[in-house]
């Protein structure tokens, strides 16, 4: 029951983002008029890939939070298997053993939500940070995402 809610929420997040992003991208071009310079196709493709990485990480974190909040650990484990590389899964498990907390959230409690924020791209890897919302406070984890394999390859504390 809860996993259907999580899947619907993830699908809704992707659908809304897919509908809004083209409008946001069109705004500056429309404001600049017909003399606007167009980015080369490679730049547009790189931008699209980066947006895909941000969407995927954001979708993962919010679906994972929903699953953990309702103690649906089977769904949480499925999400880990789908969105994390096997090396990242092993690193998360090691972090959990050492810190006695959730290795995805880097916390013992469950936040209210999450927002993935792009930082940079280098050599096929997108570097992001994820802001975890805790009422009026936030905490941050750093995330590495492989554009090649389309999985999270690392989660760490910002230090």
Language-model features: where?
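C-terminal region of N-terminal signal peptides and the immediate post-cleavage residues
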Residues: 1-7, 12, 21-48
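Hydrophobic alpha-helical membrane segments, chiefly transmembrane helices and signal peptide h-regions
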Residues: 17-21, 53-56
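Surface-exposed, charged secondary-structure patches
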Residues: 28-35, 97-138
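Short beta-strand edge/turn micro-motifs at domain boundaries
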Residues: 32, 136-159
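Core segments of small alpha/beta cavity-forming domains
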Residues: 41-98
